[in-house]
């Protein structure tokens, strides 16, 4: 996504030089969100971008692995030989974390690529007993698709709640009920001890029948190939980009899931593994490569998830010390949570309340102060909750 958007943004902003897009996968560039939804359920054959790369003068080199980069020489090393560059954009994304001990075990799947989705489609069509490891965003979306297909689904989560790494306990706790409502079993405080063909064994001694096991325990930046390049990496092995998405190497930029950037708005470095970041960042990269007017990247992060019949949206970035305000009852189909810092909205999670989400992005961008009492009233439009 981020690589495609970078190439297109360069052309849209008037870049006339050569643009080459290199990808390890053999498929035409495609969008990832539909993989856990329409593609997985067979409602769509693929999710290729409707982009005429030839008309835009973008050369595609697909199915080509890049093995390294030598910034001093301005060259990439690939399986087909070196490729020179004047400017380089790193947009390698993230790769799923594998379940230890599961490599080579029949029936164990990841869900990150088009090939992954294609391998999982017959699993759903045959209505296997499915065990999902991890109750994060991807785990919940796959469990939703599996239940829609008529599969028996058990979700195993090591933490005490779903989305433990993304949301505080009081916000994530109501979401646990969504699993049972959809006919899926959620097992928390449960760790996988081992996986065998047809079964998952937990650390409490229980055995779960599993015609298929889908692992969704997180992702890490795909940057191992940068070893020895001298390009600075962060604590999560992500590329450290600056406010203009430049790396520590001259003429090398980084964007999307593989890179973190300093946010002036939030006062910390952000690593955002979501679709919107891969769409917005490339525009900044393109502007800085062209160089007519330097651009700073400081977005209001945004993502969405469709799970168990609910549309979940999140904007911004919250911290543990932010004030949490509820808008609505979390046992109902539609509710919102707001986070305030010094009276200003920093983040919002909306379940079935897209208007709250739309209004929140503008309020976050402008650092508008809100009245906590008005903010807590779901009958009052968020934009009307401004402090007097």
Regions found by a protein language model. Give the residues of each.
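A Rossmann-like FAD-binding core segment of flavoenzymes
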Residues: 16-20, 60-78, 83, 149-241
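Glycine-rich Rossmann-fold phosphate-binding loop(s) that bind the pyrophosphate
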Residues: 1-2, 24, 112, 133-138
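Glycine/serine-rich phosphate-binding loop and adjoining beta1-alpha1 elements at the start
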Residues: 62, 71-72, 79-119
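Mid-to-C-terminal Rossmann-like scaffold of FAD/NAD(P)H-dependent oxidoreductases
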Residues: 258-356
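Rossmann-like NAD(P)H-binding beta-loop-alpha module
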Residues: 119-167
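FAD-site-proximal beta/loop scaffold in flavoenzymes
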Residues: 104-128, 199-201, 207-284
